[in-house]
Amino acid sequence: VSFTFCMLNCFGVDNQQTLQYQEENRPLSTFSQGKNPGEKKPVNYQQVAGLIDLRTTYSDGAHDLDFLIDLAKKRGFEVLFINDHDRMAMEYGIFPFRNIIRKREELPSINSRGAEKYFQGIKLAAQQHPEMILIPGSETAPFYYWTGSPFKDNLTAHNWERHLLIMGLENPQDYKNLPVLHNGFSTRYARQLSSLSIIFLILMLLGLILAAKRGYSRILGIVIIVNASLMLIEFNPFKSSLFDQYSGDQGYLPYQELIDYVEDK
């Protein structure tokens, strides 16, 4: 199946555009059939109307998926791209322990409510409406950054509304591993960050050796253990993104990281 996009506004609904969807009428397996494998056969396409960037009540949408499907059918659309938010979270932490002393705000999303449940819902809806083509995906915010300070009443988040659309990924685990800020535990960059993590582990081991002794050495060992543990937690080799929201504008790099990840799937 191949498809191309033709963006247009449709019936006055924000964040919804029509697209031109071209669907091949014969199975993909027939491409390899025939006496001459190199011979190009004519391809028949069927043009259908569709909607892109649809969000449901699974994230911040106003309607559930069944309502959107019924409305789309009434208005002559046959293809729906479902793009709920994969993660909607923001954090601000106090230096030097920004990952420990922090405030987090999060809204419902695919990953906060469960990616498996999200795809099960789309699959069930597709079975109940076989005349419709439902293509799962997400709307994602790979990066944002802070300027100002909450203590000066000028804290500002930048690029929070700079989003990308992901379409066609159907494995829930792929969404759990998206390289975006605040997406939870990830081993994607663990090897890359392991060298610095080893330093903290060595310090903790040194602290344990000193803590086993008596007197001043024991106190020093405990101090080293506590500080090395806090630094390891703050460093977090299992973070979901190589970037953070405190180092200023990172240009296109966080977005390219996400694009490369999706292209590899």
Regions found by a protein language model. Name each.
Residues 1-5:
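Gram-negative bacterial Sec-dependent N-terminal signal peptides
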Residues 6-265:
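Extended, charged catalytic domains and RNA/DNA-binding interfaces, predominantly
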